[in-house]
A protein has these predicted regions:
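N-terminal, positively charged nucleic-acid-binding surface of large information/translation enzymes
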Residues: 1-114
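Structured secondary-structure scaffolds
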Residues: 3, 11-12, 57, 80-309
Length: 309
């Protein structure tokens, strides 16, 4: 088990950022971002710091980077009628800010080939959402943010000191960083002959024999991060090591792509989806004070939202 606050996780994320940047898969761009202006102070409002109306489905309560109602993602400035979650009374402006973008468009053909290869194992909702992203045409996606928490950029210069790595570019790497942390800290002590490189058994394509299989379980809002963004990062890393061309999915020594992404639809409560951030749910400690856990296990088993909300 590992946490993304682990110092070695941060070190590896910066390493990945640097490799992708040096290989040309990250590029610097100027983007427009909402910011709040209050009492002479200015604060950028990325992602969940801003809320408004979805530009795709017109649902209220949409976030700065994604709509929970329809699953759409969009550019930050496309959100309609924005307001600050930190200070709803603050004035909202659009300002230019420089960030680094992952060139997802470079991986379009490879990701389409990968998706076609997974058609027989992906569930219909995974196939549909991934196809929607690919059919719209992939475009560069920002992987840094104007925030004061998170992993700092491995770059010098005052212009980058206030930027941090975007949480979803960083968090999906936790599968990979956790394995490397285990190898570094525990593998040799546990007697693995490969020492700190023992993690590679679980992550790289061997010269012969079956490669390790990775299966991810999640809610549907996380599908594109695991079928588009995370595979693109892995493809970029493989290419940065000179092990593979991004047009060839896997070669010996490469980091493996996922075998399956198993995603459920939303579990609903009183007409709305369960949501920790919105405090809409049934909290386990309170439930267990009154009911046996097997009651909940049975209910979730027969009502698991595998095909629809």
């Amino acid at each position: 088990y590992n946490r993304t606050t682990d110092p070695m996780h941060k070190e590896i994320v910066r390493e990945v950022f640097t490799k992708l940047l040096d290989s040309g898969f990250l590029e610097q761009r100027t983007m427009q971002q909402y910011c709040s202006v209050s009492d002479g102070s200015i604060r950028f409002l990325p992602d969940r710091y801003v809320e408004g109306t979805c530009p795709v489905c017109s649902a209220g309560g949409a976030r700065g980077d994604q709509c929970d109602s329809c699953g759409a993602t969009y550019e930050a400035h496309e959100l309609v009628d924005p307001s600050s979650k930190l200070n709803p009374d603050a004035d909202i402006e659009v300002r230019d800010t420089d960030h680094f973008f992952l060139r997802l468009n470079d991986f379009q053909a490879s990701l389409e080939a990968h998706a076609n290869d997974r058609q027989v194992v992906w569930k219909p909702n995974v196939r549909a959402m991934s196809k929607n992203w690919l059919d719209m045409g992939l475009r560069p996606r920002a992987v840094t943010r104007d925030i004061d928490w998170g992993i700092s950029l491995p770059l010098e210069g005052d212009e980058w000191s206030s930027k941090r790595v975007y949480v979803w570019f960083e968090a999906v790497q936790g599968y990979y960083t956790c394995a490397r942390i285990w190898g570094s800290r525990y593998a040799a002590a546990e007697g693995h002959p490969e020492g700190e490189l023992a993690w590679e058994k679980w992550w790289t394509v061997p010269q012969d024999g079956e490669h390790p299989r990775h299966i991810y379980f999640m809610g549907k809002d996380n599908i594109p991060f695991h079928t588009i963004i995370w595979p693109a990062i892995i493809m970029g890393l493989n290419a940065s090591e000179g092990k593979a061309d991004i047009d060839h999915l896997l070669s010996s020594g490469d980091l493996v792509l996922e075998d399956n992404v198993s995603a459920n639809e939303y579990l609903m409560l009183q007409g709305g989806q369960f949501s920790k951030s919105r405090k809409h749910g049934v909290w386990l400690p309170a439930f267990l004070e009154r009911y046996d856990p097997d009651t909940l296990r049975y209910y979730l088993s027969i009502n698991m939202p595998e095909g629809h909300d």
